[in-house]
């Protein structure tokens, strides 16, 4: 199988999965990332993308995340299409994290390729980051800014064929309408390293 992973900070949540698939020696695997000097995996071709656009420092707060995410999405999609043109690699499946917008435009380049998206978090005023981090105090704009950050997963729920969330708590933060596509699949804990004494 031809598999393309997409994550700005390779390998992200996919370290064990990528390693396991590569060890099978039965797949052609590409990993598309922005990370400089990412870890190397035998049997995995690492390729890089550059964001198409970064918002200005003083960009409008409600749209800043969307602007950055669509810049990532266009940069990743263009890089993926260039890989197909120059290297002849068109994946049978794309796997990636939706949080930074990287998967947003993959159906525009490969409408027939299934996409599995990792849905990590949906923002709301309560039970999440609002008021949690002292570095980001709650203001009268906090509810609007948190909701605006949801534009990326809202766009991507229609882009992906299947979505994964690592826990039921995370999945349940998303609107009920997402649940038809979201499956809970834990992304792993290294029990050989993280366990009670």
Write out the residue ranges for each language-model feature.
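Structural alpha-helical scaffold elements that stabilize or flank donor/cofactor-binding regions
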Residues: 87, 155-156
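Acceptor-binding helix/loop patch of EC 2.4 sugar-transfer enzymes
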Residues: 53-63, 113-151, 192-197
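Short loop/helix-cap segments at secondary-structure boundaries that form the rim of catalytic
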Residues: 35-44, 107-109, 173-177
């Amino acid at each position: 199988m031809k598999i393309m992973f997409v994550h700005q900070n390779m390998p992200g949540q996919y370290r064990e999965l990528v390693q396991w698939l590569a060890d099978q020696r039965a797949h052609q695997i590409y990993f598309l990332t922005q990370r400089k000097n990412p870890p190397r995996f035998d049997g995995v071709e690492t390729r890089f993308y550059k964001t198409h656009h970064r918002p200005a420092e003083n960009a409008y707060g409600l749209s800043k995340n969307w602007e950055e995410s669509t810049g990532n999405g266009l940069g990743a999609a263009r890089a993926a299409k260039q890989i197909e043109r120059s290297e002849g690699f068109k994946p049978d499946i794309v796997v990636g994290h939706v949080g930074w917008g990287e998967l947003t435009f993959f159906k525009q380049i490969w409408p027939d390729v299934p996409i599995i998206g990792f849905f990590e978090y949906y923002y709301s005023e309560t039970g999440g980051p609002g008021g949690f981090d002292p570095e980001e105090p709650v203001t009268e704009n906090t509810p609007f800014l948190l909701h605006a950050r949801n534009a990326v997963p809202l766009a991507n729920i229609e882009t992906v064929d299947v979505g994964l969330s690592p826990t039921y708590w995370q999945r349940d933060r998303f609107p009920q309408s997402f649940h038809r596509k979201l499956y809970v699949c834990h992304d792993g804990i290294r029990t050989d390293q993280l366990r009670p004494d």
